Amino acid sequence: MATKSNIYKDPRWLSLVEKYKDNWVLAAKELFDIDLSHQQQQIVEAIQPNNAKATVTTPHGIGRPQVLAVISTLYTIMYPDSRTVIVYPKSNACKKGIVAYVWQCWEALLKKQPFIIEYFKVGDSGLMFNEFLGMCFCNYRLNYEDSIAGHYADHLLFIIVDSAHISDRAYSIVWASMTSGDSRILLTSIPSPEEIGFFYDSHHGRALAEDNPSGVYKVIKLSAEDSPFITQEYLDHFAERYGGRNSDDYRRMILGEFPGIREAVLESDMPKTMRFSMPDGSEWTMPLRVIAKHHAQHHAKKHGVTTLEWLKSHTIPLFTADHNAIVEWAKTIPWGNVAEYAHMLKPPKDRQEISWLTAEKIIE
C-alpha cells in the first residue's frame, strides 16, 4: 500500500472526498451500490457531521449491520487517519455481520474507484488504512471494561452496539478516549425493560432538544413497522409470539419505544420510594416505580392494554390515593423479582434469610 502521506496528495482521493464528504447517502449509492432506506439515511446523516453524537433505537429489521458497515467504511475512507471502534456485547455474530457488509462495500468500491486498493485493505476487523488506523472491534464484557480503553486518533468514531447492555463504567472509558476535535459516538440498541443506564439517559436527560439545549445526543427513534425490510407476516408472527401489539416486548423490540414507566411515575404525585424493615433487622429502600410497574403489567395483560396505559389510568391514581394499596400489592411480589432494585440502608443483625413478603413497609 502507498504511504499515509501520499493519499493526501492523490487527486483521485481528493476528488472523491470533495464530492462525498458532505453526502454519505449519495456515497453509499454511487460507491457501494446501496440505496439506504429512509431509516438508515437518518442514522448516516446524524453521525456524518464533525464531532457528532447520536443515539438510535434500533428494533429488529431496520438493517443495522449494513448501515454500520457503510458508516465505518466511509469514515475510514474520508478520514484515513481515523479510528472506528465498534463495541459489541454479544457473540461474534455481530462482528461477522458487519464485516460481511464491509466486504460488499469494498468489492463495489473497487469497481468504481480501483485506485483505493493502493491505500486500504479489508481484513477480519474490516477496512484498515494501516496497522493502527481504520476499523477495529472490541468485545465488551462486564467487569472487563478496560479492554475497550486506549483508542485515540485525530478522527475517532465509537459505535456502541446494543448500548442498553453496556455498563456506565464502559461509557466512562469511552468518553475518556474522546479527546480530539472530531470525536464521534453512535449508540444503537433496542430499549431495555429497565429504564436506567447510559442509553436511557441519552434519550432523555442527555438528549439534545428545544427544551434541553445543553443536551449532547441527537435522538432518533425507529420502528420496525416503518422498515421496508419487514413484512406484515413477520410483524403478525412477532405479535403472536410476544403477547400482542400492546405487549411491552412488542413495543420495545418492534416499535423501538421505551416502557415510559419511569417518566410517568416521576411526573405523578405518587410516592417515589418505599422503605421497609426485614425480620433480620436490616432496613431497605426501593423505588416505588418497581412496585407500580409490577401492578400495571399484571393488570394490563388481563385487559389487553399496554403497561403504560394501565399505569396512568389505574395504578398511579390508586397508589396516589391509597398508600395501603401499595403495601398490599408489594406483599404479593416475590423478593427475587425486586431484590436487584432494593438498596440496603442498615445491615441485618444476623444472617437469617431475608423475608420480603412479611417485611414492614413504610411509604414515603
What residues fall within each predicted segment?
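Short, mixed-charge low-complexity intrinsically disordered segments
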Residues: 303-364
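Short, flexible N-terminal segments of the mature chain
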Residues: 284-314
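Short, extreme N-terminal segment that most often corresponds to the first beta-strand
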Residues: 269-291
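Short intrinsically disordered terminal tails
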Residues: 1-2, 269-273, 361-364
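Generic alpha-helical secondary-structure signal
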Residues: 97, 253, 294, 313, ...
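Alpha-helix N-cap recognition
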Residues: 65, 90, 288-290, 306, ...
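Phosphate/NTP-binding elements of NTP-utilizing enzymes
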Residues: 2-268
